[in-house]
C-alpha cells in the first residue's frame, strides 16, 4: 500500500522543524516573542492551511531555509578569517570584525531563525580604550606619534590600519552596532595608538630618506654621529671581519636576548641598547669568525632580530681613529654595554699608552731591514705588504700615519736595491749558488734533469764540463747555446735554470735602446731566449768580447757608463750558429747543445721530466764537487749560513730593570 500523505517520522520535513520547536517551547520555558499575544484565545483559525500537504512547497521551503542558513554561516566564517588577518596587522579587537561592524543573521526570513542558529551566541562588546597586541613584536614604552589612516571600504564602511578600533556599547541590543549591508552611516572611529614596534617600523618604512632619518635618530639617541665610528664601504659585497651595526625597531624581548643569539657567530661583541621613537635601537660592534659582506651580515641580523634589512646601518669600524677606539673602550667598561670576547687589537693599540708612543716614531731602517729580509725590491709590493703589518707592527702603523709615505717608500726601495746589489757583488758563483740553495725547500730529485739530457742525446759528462766552465766564466766558454727545432724544451730547460739562480733575462726587441744591456750589471747569469738571424748578426758585430767573457762597457739610464766583466750568457735558438757561414767568428766563442727531440708530455698534459727549483738544488748538491764549486770556511757565519747575516740595526740588550 502507498504511504499516506505526510509522515509520522521525527526530525524530517516541516513536521520535524515544528516538532523540535514545540519541544523547546514546552520544556525550556523560553520567553515568547513580543509579536504574539498570550491572552488571545486559540481558535485554531490561524492554523488553517498552514501546512501545505503538497511536497513541492515543502521541499522549496526546506531548500530556501537551508540555503539561508548556509549563506549566513559562510559569511560569518569568512568574516572571522578576515578578522584574524586584519587583527594581525591592525591590532583589532577580537570582538569586532575587520570592517568595525558585527555580522548578524538576517532575521527577516523567520522570527525563530536566529534561535536555531548553529553558531555560538554573540558575546557582549566591552569597552577597551587600549588594546594589547600579541603579534609577537611586543610594545614599546617610547611615546610615538598617533597616526590614523582611514580607507573607504568596498561598501562605504571605514577600514582603519595602524591602530585598534574601540568597541563601545551604546545600550542597544546585541548586534545592532553595525551591519554588513553598508547602509549605515560612516561614523568616525577613534584610533588609539598601540605604541607597538610593528607600528613604529611602519613609520620608519614610510620615510622617504630612510638613511638620513636613521642617521638623525641615531645621533639624537646616542649623542654622536654614526659616521664618527665607521668608515664607508661602497660595495655591499666587500668582505670584512669587523662590522658596526645600528638596528632600529627591535622587539625589547628579542633585544635582551641578542647577546645569546649572536654568540655562535662572533669572536667579539660590544652591544648597546637604547630606546628611540621607532622602538629599541641596538648599536653593536661585532667581530665575526670569518670575513662577511654587508649583505650577509644584514641577512643574518634580520633573521635573528626579525627586523627588515632596510632598517639597519651597517659599516666597518674606523681602525685608526683614536676617538672611535676610545668610545668603544670607555663604553665597554661602563654598565651601558654588554661585552664578550677578546678586545680587538686595533682598540688596544689605540688606547694603550705604550702603543701610542711606539706608533708615533717611524724608523726607516726597520722597514729597509724588513724589505731586505723578504727580498722585496718593487715599491708597490713593499707598500702593500708593509701596510698589512700595521695591525701587529708598530713601525708599520707609524708608516701609515705618516704624511711622507711615498718618500719613505722610495727611499726604502732604493736602499734595499743598493744593499742587495752590494751583497751579490761580494759573493762568488759558489757562494751565490749556496745562497740560492738555502732559500729553497728540500725534497727535489736530480734525476729528471739527467734523464732529460739523455732524452735529447746529450752526454751528461760533456754537459757537466761545459757547465763547469760556464759558471766560472772561462774565456771562450762563457756562452751556452741550446739549439734545435721548435717544441723541444730548450726554453723550458733554460728558464728553469735562470729562475733557480735568479738570473736576468734580456730581450733583443729592446736592442734599439742604448740601455737594453743594463740588466747585465746586476746579475750572475743572463739569458736571451729565441735568438734569430738578426740577433746573431748583432752579436757577431757588437758583442764578441761579451761572449768571450771579457770586460765590457755598458750604458745605464741616468747614470754613467760602467765597466764590468760580462756574466755568463745562456741562449736558445732554432738556428745552429756554428754551422752557418755568416758568423764564422762565433763558433769558437759558444758551446752548442742540440735538442733534436720534441718535449714529452703524459696523457694529462704534464711534462714527463719535471724541472723546478727543488730539482736544480738537488742537482747542484749532487754535482757540487764535479762542478768545482768550493767555499772558503770563513765565509760562513756563526749560525752556519754561507754568508754573514745582514743587520741594519744594532742588537738590543733586553735585561730587567
Swiss-Prot record:
Keywords: ATP-binding, DNA replication, DNA-binding, Early protein, Helicase, Host nucleus, Hydrolase, Isomerase, Isopeptide bond, Nucleotide-binding, Phosphoprotein, Ubl conjugation. ATP binds at residues 484-491. It is found in: Host nucleus. Residues 458-608 form the SF3 helicase domain. Residues 155-188, 633-657 are annotated as: Disordered. GO terms for cellular component: host cell cytoplasm; host cell nucleus. It catalyses: Couples ATP hydrolysis with the unwinding of duplex DNA by translocating in the 3'-5' direction; ATP + H2O = ADP + phosphate + H(+). A motif (Nuclear localization signal) lies at residues 86-88. Residues 147-444 are annotated as: SMARCB1/INI1-binding. It comes from the Viruses. GO terms for molecular function: ATP binding; ATP hydrolysis activity; DNA binding; DNA helicase activity. Phosphorylated. Sumoylated. Its EC number is 5.6.2.4. A motif (Nuclear export signal) lies at residues 109-118. Residues 175-188 have a biased composition (Polar residues). There is a cross-link at residue 565 (Glycyl lysine isopeptide (Lys-Gly) (interchain with G-Cter in SUMO)). It is an enzyme of class 5 (isomerase). The modification Phosphoserine is found at residue 110. Belongs to the papillomaviridae E1 protein family. Can form hexamers. Interacts with E2 protein; this interaction increases E1 DNA binding specificity. Interacts with host DNA polymerase subunit POLA2. Interacts with host single stranded DNA-binding protein RPA1. Interacts with host TOP1; this interaction stimulates the enzymatic activity of TOP1. Interacts with human SMARCB1/INI1 protein, stimulating viral replication. This is Replication protein E1. The gene is E1.
Amino acid at each position: 500500500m502507498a504511504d499516506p500523505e505526510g509522515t509520522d517520522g521525527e526530525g524530517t520535513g516541516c513536521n520535524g522543524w515544528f516538532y523540535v520547536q514545540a519541544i523547546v517551547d514546552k520544556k525550556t520555558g523560553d520567553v515568547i516573542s513580543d509579536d504574539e499575544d498570550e491572552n488571545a484565545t486559540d481558535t485554531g483559525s490561524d492554523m488553517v492551511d498552514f501546512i501545505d500537504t503538497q511536497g513541492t512547497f515543502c521541499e522549496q521551503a526546506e531548500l530556501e531555509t537551508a540555503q539561508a542558513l548556509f549563506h549566513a554561516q559562510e559569511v560569518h566564517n569568512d568574516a572571522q578569517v578576515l578578522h584574524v588577518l586584519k587583527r594581525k596587522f591592525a591590532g583589532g579587537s577580537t570582538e569586532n570584525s575587520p570592517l568595525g561592524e558585527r555580522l548578524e543573521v538576517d532575521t527577516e526570513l523567520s522570527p525563530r531563525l536566529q534561535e536555531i542558529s548553529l553558531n555560538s551566541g554573540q558575546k557582549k562588546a566591552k569597552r577597551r580604550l587600549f588594546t594589547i597586541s600579541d603579534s609577537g613584536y611586543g610594545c614599546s614604552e617610547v611615546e610615538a606619534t598617533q597616526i590614523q589612516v582611514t580607507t573607504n571600504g568596498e561598501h562605504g564602511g571605514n577600514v582603519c590600519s595602524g591602530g585598534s578600533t574601540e568597541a563601545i556599547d551604546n545600550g542597544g541590543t546585541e548586534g545592532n552596532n553595525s551591519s554588513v549591508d553598508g547602509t549605515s552611516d560612516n561614523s568616525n572611529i577613534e584610533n588609539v595608538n598601540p605604541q607597538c614596534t610593528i607600528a613604529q617600523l611602519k613609520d620608519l618604512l614610510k620615510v622617504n630618506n630612510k638613511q638620513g632619518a636613521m642617521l638623525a635618530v641615531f645621533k639624537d639617541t646616542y649623542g654622536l654621529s654614526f659616521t664618527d665610528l665607521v668608515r664607508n664601504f661602497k660595495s655591499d659585497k666587500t668582505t670584512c671581519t669587523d662590522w658596526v651595526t645600528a638596528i632600529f625597531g627591535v622587539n625589547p624581548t628579542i633585544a635582551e636576548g641578542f647577546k645569546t643569539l649572536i654568540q655562535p657567530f662572533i669572536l667579539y661583541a660590544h652591544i648597546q641598547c637604547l630606546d628611540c621613537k621607532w622602538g629599541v635601537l641596538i648599536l653593536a660592534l661585532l667581530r665575526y669568525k670569518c670575513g662577511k659582506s654587508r649583505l650577509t651580515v644584514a641577512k643574518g641580523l634580520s633573521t635573528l632580530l626579525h627586523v627588515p634589512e632596510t632598517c639597519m646601518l651597517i659599516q666597518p669600524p674606523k681602525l685608526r681613529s683614536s676617538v672611535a677606539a676610545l668610545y668603544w673602550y670607555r663604553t665597554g667598561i661602563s654598565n651601558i654595554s654588554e661585552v664578550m670576547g677578546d678586545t680587538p687589537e686595533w682598540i688596544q693599540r689605540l688606547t694603550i699608552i705604550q702603543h701610542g708612543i711606539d706608533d708615533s716614531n717611524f724608523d726607516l731602517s726597520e722597514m729597509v731591514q724588513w724589505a731586505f729580509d723578504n727580498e722585496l725590491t718593487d715599491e708597490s709590493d713593499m707598500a702593500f705588504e708593509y701596510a698589512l703589518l700595521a695591525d701587529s707592527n708598530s713601525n708599520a702603523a707609524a708608516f701609515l700615519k705618516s704624511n711622507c709615505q711615498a718618500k719613505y717608500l722610495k727611499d726604502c726601495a732604493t736602499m734595499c736595491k743598493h744593499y742587495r746589489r752590494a751583497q751579490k757583488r761580494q759573493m762568488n758563483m759558489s757562494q751565490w749558488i749556496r745562497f740560492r740553495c738555502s732559500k729553497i725547500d728540500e725534497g727535489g730529485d736530480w734525476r729528471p734533469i739527467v734523464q732529460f739530457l739523455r732524452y735529447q742525446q746529450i752526454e751528461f759528462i760533456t754537459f757537466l764540463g761545459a757547465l763547469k766552465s760556464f759558471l766560472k766564466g772561462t774565456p771562450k766558454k762563457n756562452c751556452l747555446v741550446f739549439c734545435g727545432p721548435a717544441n723541444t724544451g730548450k726554453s723550458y730547460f733554460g728558464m728553469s735554470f735562470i729562475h733557480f739562480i735568479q738570473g736576468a733575462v734580456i730581450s733583443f726587441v729592446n736592442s734599439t735602446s742604448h740601455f737594453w744591456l743594463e740588466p747585465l750589471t746586476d746579475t750572475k747569469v743572463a739569458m736571451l731566449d729565441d735568438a734569430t738571424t738578426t740577433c746573431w748578426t748583432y752579436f757577431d758585430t757588437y758583442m764578441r768580447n761579451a761572449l768571450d767573457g771579457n770586460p765590457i762597457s755598458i750604458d745605464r739610464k741616468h747614470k754613467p757608463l760602467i765597466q764590468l766583466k760580462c756574466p755568463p750568457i745562456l741562449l736558445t735558438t732554432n738556428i745552429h750558429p756554428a754551422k752557418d757561414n755568416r758568423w764564422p767568428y762565433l763558433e769558437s766563442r759558444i758551446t752548442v747543445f742540440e735538442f733534436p727531440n720534441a718535449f714529452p708530455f703524459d696523457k694529462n698534459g704534464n711534462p714527463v721530466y719535471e724541472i723546478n727549483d727543488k730539482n736544480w738544488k738537488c742537482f747542484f748538491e749532487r754535482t757540487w764537487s764535479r762542478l768545482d764549486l768550493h767555499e772558503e770556511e770563513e765565509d760562513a757565519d756563526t749560525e752556519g749560513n754561507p754568508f754573514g747575516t745582514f743587520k741594519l740595526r744594532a742588537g738590543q740588550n733586553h735585561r730587567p730593570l
